[in-house]
Design a protein with these regions (language model features):
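One-carbon transfer enzymes
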Residues: 1-160
Length: 160
């Protein structure tokens, strides 16, 4: 990991990254909207691959094009179900439970110019248990994310 970029100055990952000697940057929405500027910032740091986690802003088209096929995102549902703008975190888990779904999981996908729309790289499933709450489902989904996202990122980077 060469750089951790966040839109939230209070993100816990920033402190963890700094403690490991990883450069960190916090960007505001106005700066981030300039996709050419962000792509240039990343190129100057020789960033070859982008992995998103908990980043809720739609990426500017210029950035998506500059890193076409080299941006991954993780989503806490089996896309295309429960994806799209505004569907994140507990909102997803609550919707899954309220719909009576019998399974949920995570989707790791390439990023394009539409929320949660890119080509699926991997899906991992789990059973929604009777009596499941959004909080208990979130905890189990996080376990899937921690187990599979780093390995999937590594596998995709090795293909470059």
């Amino acid at each position: 990991v060469a750089l951790l970029l966040s839109n939230r100055p209070d993100a816990g990952a920033l402190g963890r990254a700094r403690a490991l000697g990883v450069e960190t940057l916090v960007v505001d929405r106005e700066t981030f909207r300039d996709g050419d500027r962000v792509a240039g910032l990343l190129a100057r740091r020789q960033i070859d691959f982008i992995a998103l986690a908990g980043f809720l802003w739609l990426l500017p088209p210029e950035l998506v094009h500059a890193y076409a096929g080299r941006i991954l995102n993780i989503h806490p549902s089996l896309l295309p179900a429960y994806g799209g703008k505004g569907m994140y975190g507990d909102r997803v888990h609550r919707a899954v439970i309220e719909a009576g779904e019998r399974e949920s999981g995570i989707t790791i996908h390439r990023v394009d110019e539409v929320y949660d729309n890119g080509d699926v790289v991997a899906r991992y499933r789990l059973e929604v248990r009777p009596g499941e709450t959004p909080e208990s489902l979130a905890a189990r989904i996080h376990e899937l994310e921690y187990a599979h996202y780093p390995r999937t990122i590594e596998r995709e980077i090795m293909k470059l």
